[in-house]
Amino acid sequence: MRRAFGASLPTDEELAISREITEFDRTLAFFDGPDVVATAGIFSYEMTVPGGRLRCAGVTRVAVLSTHRRRGLLTAMMRRQLADVHERGEPLAALYASEAPIYGRFGYGLATYQTALEIDRPHGTFAQTLSGNGRLTMVDVPTAVPAFTRVWEQARQSQPGMLGLDERWIRNQLADLELHRDGASPHYRVLYQLGDDPAGFAIYRIKMDWDASGPNGTVRLGMLIAATTEAYASLWRHVLDVDLMTRITAEMRPVEEPLRFLLADSRQPRTRVEDGIWLRLVDVLAALAGRRYAVEGQLVLGVRDGFCPWNAGQFELRGGPTAAEARRTTASPDLELDAAALGALYLGGNRFGTLHRAGLIREVQPGAVARADAMFATDRAPWCPSHF
């Protein structure tokens, strides 16, 4: 995989970190003689969906050497993976795409978005004075792992798109490899506690620089996760107050970042929207029944799925805020769409109306698009803040 992405071979430290999370029984490889020429893997996750949680296969480490392109290796691995996911009863599969055009043909749709942001520190003043009873402390990795794991579990309860991470995975997210520093410092790990209870954390680096006018450093925020509004504001205040810095940068932030409304200068932060995770419904019935819906409603969806033919057909969905059920039906569909479009819509990060105007949904029954948008609406935009 490293060769296919133009990277150097992994160090012993990288291999040790990778080995702890690798599921070798879910790892595929093509060989040409003794040489590995294509790879794909899966991590077994649980994803928060609107109103619930579902098992999700995290597709990862997908690569084909340039010498072996256009031979069907990627298609064969995708087909093998999705058959395995289906056999294991995982309703969802998700991935990050190195190139956007690749995965739509396999039924993946762009389901979440994220932002990269930059803030000029002089414009980082809050509109109101911060109040709170919590405390911030710098922590080492042994302290951070259990505390950050507790925070993560609390935060993901209400955040569609977040994946469940145990201590093994939090330790992986805390890995502080030299190749990731790009001239910046080692990690700073900050824990926010209310009493003895962890409620938020931030991980960042600082890149020190000087010019003729003085210090000109950058805070590179790697992750900020908070289970309470107080923890969120306090952690951002800390990041914005690091001495000798003139700017703060961050990636993989939510599109609905409350920080903008905390700042006196609402034109900060400057943001760039990027694609997040691509989602595929591997079991349409289980996925539709496994989430909850903003309003009570009924829809018949006609789904086209050439890559996973067990998903093709008409599905009647009845759901609301407290319960949902789905079943196959022979009734005429209200809407017709393919698997990739359904994946893009499932978490609520895109609107049926938008995809309808793009020609990706056929509205058979008038008013069905508006009804679907009302049902699939969420109070939070989906967000996945972890790499895999």
Region roles according to the model:
Residues 8-20, 25-29, 39-47, 51, ...:
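N-terminal, Lys/Arg-enriched amphipathic/low-complexity engagement segments
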Residues 59-86, 228-240:
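Conserved acetyl-CoA-binding loop-helix of GNAT-fold acetyltransferases
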Residues 11, 28, 36, 40, ...:
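N-terminal membrane-targeting/anchoring modules of bacterial envelope and secretion proteins
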Residues 3-7, 32, 128-388:
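Intrinsically disordered, low-complexity, positively biased terminal segments
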Residues 86-92, 96-117, 234, 255-270:
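Conserved active-site alpha-helix within GNAT-family acetyltransferase domains
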Residues 29, 35-45, 56-58, 63, ...:
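Conserved beta-strand in the GNAT
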Residues 1, 28-30, 58, 72:
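Hydrophobic, small-residue-rich alpha-helical packing segments that form membrane-like cores
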Residues 47-58, 69, 209-218:
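A conserved beta-turn-beta hairpin within the catalytic core of GNAT-like acetyltransferases
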